[in-house]
Amino acid sequence: MTDSTHPTPSARPPRQPRTGTTGTGARKAGSKSGRSRAREFALQALYQHLVGGNDATAIDVFTRDLSGFHKADAAHYDALLHGCITTAQYMDELIAPQLDRKMSEISPIEHAVMWIGVYEFQHCQDVPWRVVINECIELAKEFGGTDGHKYVNGVLNGLAPQLRATEVAADKAAARG
């Protein structure tokens, strides 16, 4: 028996599953662009370089044989892998002042993701700075530790005004109205 003055709350409709994302909120493979896939493969290759000290050529041969590589933007992958390895010391010098710990204490996944972000800030001017950060956050969510994406976000947000000064300033001015 229900009281007519207090109607029973209507049941919520069943929650609709989010399409295009994994349980961590990262995008599913089917909804990723060729560049996003290239970043994933570059991350895996850079991880091998950081952890195993493997040569870029050997890593490249191995990575190109992985399932799904044919869907990646191979030119972007090449630029990321070889560009990050070639400029690693310089990128670490840019990243280090943003860290709250020694570089050696940073997870190799987060380290590689930050390299990708710094490289794209410097060499991929066609990719907006916010997109660079968002793509790196997605990589850290999918491959990194529990809160690694927050750390990557903080570091890259700290570097963006330095590496993309004009673009960041224009965005902030536009946001102020």
Swiss-Prot record:
Q: Which residues fall in a compositionally biased region of kind Low complexity? A: 17-28
Pfam families associated with the record: NusB
Which InterPro entries does UniProt cross-reference here?
Answer: NusB-like_sf, NusB_fam, NusB_RsmB_TIM44
GO biological process per UniProt: DNA-templated transcription termination; transcription antitermination
Region annotation (Disordered) ranges: 1-35
Q: Name one GO cellular component term.
A: cytosol
Q: Which domain of life is it from?
A: Bacteria
Q: Which GO terms describe its molecular function?
A: RNA binding
Q: Keywords for this entry?
A: RNA-binding, Transcription, Transcription antitermination, Transcription regulation
Q: Tell me the function of this protein.
A: Involved in transcription antitermination. Required for transcription of ribosomal RNA (rRNA) genes. Binds specifically to the boxA antiterminator sequence of the ribosomal RNA (rrn) operons.
Q: Which family does it belong to?
A: Belongs to the NusB family.
Q: What is this protein called?
A: Transcription antitermination protein NusB
Organism, as annotated: Acidovorax sp. (strain JS42)
